[in-house]
Amino acid sequence: MKTKFCTGGEAEPSPLGLLLSCGGSAAPTPGVGQQRDAAGELESKQLGGRSQPLALPPPPPPPLPLPPPPSPPLADEQPEPRTRRRAYLWCKEFLPGAWRGLREDQFHISVIRGGLSNMLFQCSLPDSIASVGDEPRKVLLRLYGAILKMRSCNKEGSEQAQNENEFQGAEAMVLESVMFAILAERSLGPKLYGIFPQGRLEQFIPSRRLDTEELCLPDISAEIAEKMATFHGMKMPFNKEPKWLFGTMEKYLNQVLRLKFSREARVQQLHKFLSYNLPLELENLRSLLQYTRSPVVFCHNDCQEGNILLLEGQENSEKQKLMLIDFEYSSYNYRGFDIGNHFCEWMYDYTYEKYPFFRANIQKYPTRKQQLHFISSYLTTFQNDFESLSSEEQSATKEDMLLEVNRFALASHFLWGLWSIVQAKISSIEFGYMEYAQARFDAYFDQKRKLGV
């Protein structure tokens, strides 16, 4: 979700739906970008994404800027002509009714800002064109970004490794497309109107994303808990083994240990991270979580404010005013990670407009009272007999879950700390990745101290 913007690729629209090409022209090709470091200097970047374990969706990058309809379309910002042409053909070929006879000069498209793993556009019919049936007048076009073009962190990676990463990225997109279609059919996500190798057409939902400070509002927090519990209760046709979490951390750690920076400031920052003895920390974390009871459920894996929509017109409703989006990183995983990761996101504001483009406040981590409020709402939805338990049994269940999610919050910090170090090498986005990694590791060690582990 937050790896980078990329420009369109070469391939023309394909009507073959789920046929996913792994070739270089099948995915949007990133444009070469530069990133400004803390001193204001520009450093050229090799673009690329994150490599993932086979047969599992890719990991969720933490919430730097965000996806579907976060920001309104920019009326004065148009895509490049090639992207506009391809968008027109996709809409004309995949959408019914008035779209079928639409001329290209009648086609309206505008950029939606906020997507960093993908490019997002609003495509619409002009007011002068009448609807034929119940076809949508506006749709969201998502062009896949980094996930399809995963690359090793170092240029000296073997061709075999590069091909494997590319295959894994393509495989992840197939899985995500299947997942999106299933959730759409179950009315748990936006409707799916079209799918093709380079992206998809989705329902455009009038809404806005939540702000970080809204996560702590009691009614918002309770509904997020209920939505997450419903998500966790789903049966999905994916690998049920919880390999994603530690498989991803191991892969990131191996990449971090091979990283080389040319700038002295980056070299010193990397040395500081390596001084933490990250391999030993990972093994200690693995040992701790092995003895932490946490059911394996179908997890969102990126339930932060940018992936939660507040539906337009539902702002004053008591319930059913939120929708979870961006399922591309979902997988079977430990429940404690999904909830602990959500709690960690209370601390980070990614809307700050100056370097390093985020603000961290460790004091924003939910209090015991706020955690219990979330957990109570979660258990009421997730566990059918929870409300029939005695007060003592309910209290014991909630205490166990408090320990579970706060231990797994350590994994959230560790995962995104490693991820951000890797992004400092490969991302073209202007963001303080090394500073963000430091913030996550600072929070990791603070959480360890509080837990006494």
From Swiss-Prot:
InterPro entries (UniProt xref): Kinase-like_dom_sf
Biased composition range(s): Pro residues: 55-73
GO molecular function, one term: protein tyrosine kinase activity
Pfam entry (one): Choline_kinase
Record's keyword terms, sorted: Acetylation, ATP-binding, Cytoplasm, Kinase, Lipid biosynthesis, Lipid droplet, Lipid metabolism, Nucleotide-binding, Phospholipid biosynthesis, Phospholipid metabolism, Phosphoprotein, Transferase
Known EC number: 2.7.1.32, 2.7.1.82
Binding site for ATP: 113-119, 142, 203-209, 304, 326
Binding site for phosphocholine: 115-117
GO biological process: CDP-choline pathway; cellular response to glucose starvation; choline metabolic process; ethanolamine metabolic process; lipid droplet disassembly; phosphatidylcholine biosynthetic process; phosphatidylethanolamine biosynthetic process; response to 3-methylcholanthrene
Tissue expr: Testis, brain, lung, kidney and liver.
Sequence similarity: Belongs to the choline/ethanolamine kinase family.
UniProt subunit comment: Heterodimer with CHKB. Homodimer.
Descriptive protein name: Choline kinase alpha
Organism: Rattus norvegicus (Rat)
Designated gene of the protein: Chka
